A protein has these predicted regions:
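Short glycine-rich loop/turn motifs that provide flexible caps or phosphate-binding loops at active sites
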Residues: 27, 59, 65, 77, ...
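C-terminal domain-tail junction helix/linker
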Residues: 181-197, 201-206
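Charged alpha-helix within mobile-element recombinases
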Residues: 10-20, 165-166, 188-191, 195
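Polybasic low-complexity intrinsically disordered regions
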Residues: 1-127, 132-134, 199
Length: 206
């Protein structure tokens, strides 16, 4: 199942059903990433990695051995629209273009994704750019940009709640398997379970 990519295929089938039911709002996409611990314990210095697809990165002052889960969440419904799994060292910015669905009215993301060319590309496609503005060397952010950042941050909180739910209730704080292929399939299945439960909630509210 994992080798054949059936997890992603099943997720796509559910996405079609959610669209047919009119549950996906497309008001905006909330894009973010979170760190997930690898299944085996981290290797000691000089030891070979117990998981060849996991990697080290730093979170604040602490080291982290594992993976990074990237999500695209539908603003308004809270449904997961896309998911990706990479090593922890992979920059979330590198995956941004692949996380944009293309049919959303807006995209909201934190400052890690901020690039002028990226913002222009979104606007050229008619997509509102809600990427948080970052100060650059010799170019501090303006007061207007600070106000926008506060609004973008409020909108983005919804994706952080999704991550919190996935880690608290679906065990996404640690991988269950060794290797990216099996873990990627497992996380697609978790995304399916999350969306099925969310679907029942949304249908009950209509």
């Amino acid at each position: 199942m994992a080798q054949a990519g059936l997890g992603e295929s099943l997720f796509a089938l559910l996405e079609e059903q959610l669209q047919a039911k009119g549950l996906i709002v497309r008001r905006g996409s909330l894009i973010d990433a979170t760190l997930v611990k690898a299944q085996p314990h981290p290797p000691r210095r000089g030891e070979p990695s117990p998981d060849p697809d996991a990697d080290w990165t730093r979170r604040g002052k602490d080291g982290h051995f594992g993976y990074k889960v990237h999500l695209t969440v539908d603003q308004g419904s809270g449904l997961i629209r896309h998911l990706a799994l990479t090593s922890a060292r992979t920059s979330e910015s590198n995956l941004f273009e692949g996380m944009v669905i293309g049919d959303e009215a807006a995209v909201f993301a934190d400052g890690a994704y901020a690039k002028d060319a990226r913002k222009k590309a979104l606007r050229s496609r008619g997509i509102f750019c809600g990427i948080i503005n970052r100060p650059w060397r010799y170019r501090p952010i303006t007061e207007n940009q600070k106000r926008r950042n506060k609004f973008y941050s409020r909108v983005r909180r919804a994706v952080e709640r999704v991550f919190g739910t996935l880690k608290r209730l679906y065990g996404m704080d640690r991988c269950r398997y060794v290797g990216g292929v099996r873990n990627r399939c497992h996380f697609w299945l978790k995304g399916i379970c999350f969306n099925l439960k969310k679907m029942l909630v949304l249908q009950g509210a209509t």
